[in-house]
């Protein structure tokens, strides 16, 4: 009974009260996934920055993290997340995260290899409590914002987006 409704999952699926679109026997609302979405613009590295999930999507393991690659080496950036997805021009790129926005401090330095990382902490604000609390079964949208002085223009760009549904 992954969704805690006191009905066996197989019975939920058979009764049609839970969907199982992929036919794996687990109700869709109980599955976790990370899907990249939204288009990023090329930055001064010549490539668009890409965001990825690292570790496990199971909150209980405490290993979930974020990684952005193809970023301008030596710059600084900030991972952030929100309650919905959008697609709108923003600085030198596109904003992919909307709704209520939560920043993940501290800022992340981009290494010489063009990679920035952030290890999630589900025990502190904003991920651990309040409006930005991440809990099993919740879906959030992540993106990486970074300085890009050599690119000119607004001197700021963003990665693509990452939609994550965390495991119960």
Model-found features: residue ranges?
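Extracellular calcium-associated, cysteine-rich motifs in secreted modular proteins
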Residues: 1-33
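Residue-level hotspots within well-ordered secondary structure
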Residues: 32-168
């Amino acid at each position: 009974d992954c969704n805690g409704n006191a009905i066996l999952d197989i019975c939920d699926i058979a009764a049609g009260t839970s969907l199982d679109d992929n036919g794996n026997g687990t109700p869709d609302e109980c599955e976790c996934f990370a899907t990249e979405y939204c288009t990023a613009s090329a930055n001064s590295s010549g490539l668009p920055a890409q965001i990825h999930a690292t570790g496990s999507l199971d909150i209980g393991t405490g290993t979930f993290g974020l990684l952005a690659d193809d970023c301008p080496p030596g710059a600084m950036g900030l991972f952030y997340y929100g309650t919905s997805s959008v697609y709108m021009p923003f600085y030198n790129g596109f904003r992919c995260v909307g709704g209520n926005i939560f920043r993940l401090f501290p800022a992340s330095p981009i290494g010489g290899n063009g990679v920035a990382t952030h290890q999630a902490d589900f025990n502190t604000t904003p991920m651990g409590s309040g409006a930005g609390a991440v809990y099993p079964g919740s879906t959030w949208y992540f993106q990486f914002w970074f300085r890009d002085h050599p690119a000119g223009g607004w001197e700021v760009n963003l990665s693509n987006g990452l939609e994550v549904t965390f495991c119960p």
